[in-house]
Amino acid sequence: VRAAGKRVLYQPASVVIHYEGISHGTDTGSGVKAHQVDNQKKFYKRWADELGTRHLDNAVNPFRARDRSIHQKTILVVDHYVPQPDRDAGSRSIWCFLREFKAMGLNVKFWPANLWHDPQYTALLQQEGIEVYYGNEYAGRFAEWVQEHGANLDYVLLSRPHVAQEHLDPVRAHTRAKVLFYGHD
């Protein structure tokens, strides 16, 4: 579809569930599964050009591979919470920044300092193709996350003085990203 010049859309809220071996077992030496090995070779042969230019090898840099951002610059935006653009001017500003960064072709990540999943606005950002980090699994782990993924960040926008103060040191220590600051008021 892409090769034909068509737009490809995906649904960020979609879920793929796969139970390996439930339908036909796991033995590739017999039965229907015996075709799996041959079909895998045919698949790689058919899609070799695409896999070689637009994809990374298996398990190489999943941060970039999972959202096909191999050839894009990545920006991480950090603000105090998921913006609510119809409720306050600061949120409106950040919302516009996020959408504009996406329109510029950047791979956009958003880290709300409070890590709260706003059921309305988080989903809207995700529908725009913006990855939003939230939940207990990230609590107290910003520095660790930046240490692990900092090499993939080209820009970091820190919003508001108290947010910048809390997040600047790990960004400087673990990335070569250009740091931007937006102070609001």
Predicted segments with their positions:
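A short, conserved alpha-helix in the catalytic core of glycosyltransferases
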Residues: 1-17
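A short, charged/proline- and glycine-enriched loop
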Residues: 68-81, 104-105
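Extended catalytic core of nucleotide-activated donor transferases of GT-like folds
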Residues: 81-87, 91-100, 104, 109-185
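Flexible, glycine-rich active-site loops centered on histidine and acidic residues
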Residues: 21-27
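C-terminal, non-catalytic tails of nucleotide-sugar-dependent glycosyltransferases
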Residues: 8, 28-74
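Phosphate/oxyanion-binding loops and surfaces in catalytic or ligand/nucleic-acid-binding neighborhoods
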Residues: 4, 19, 46-50, 174
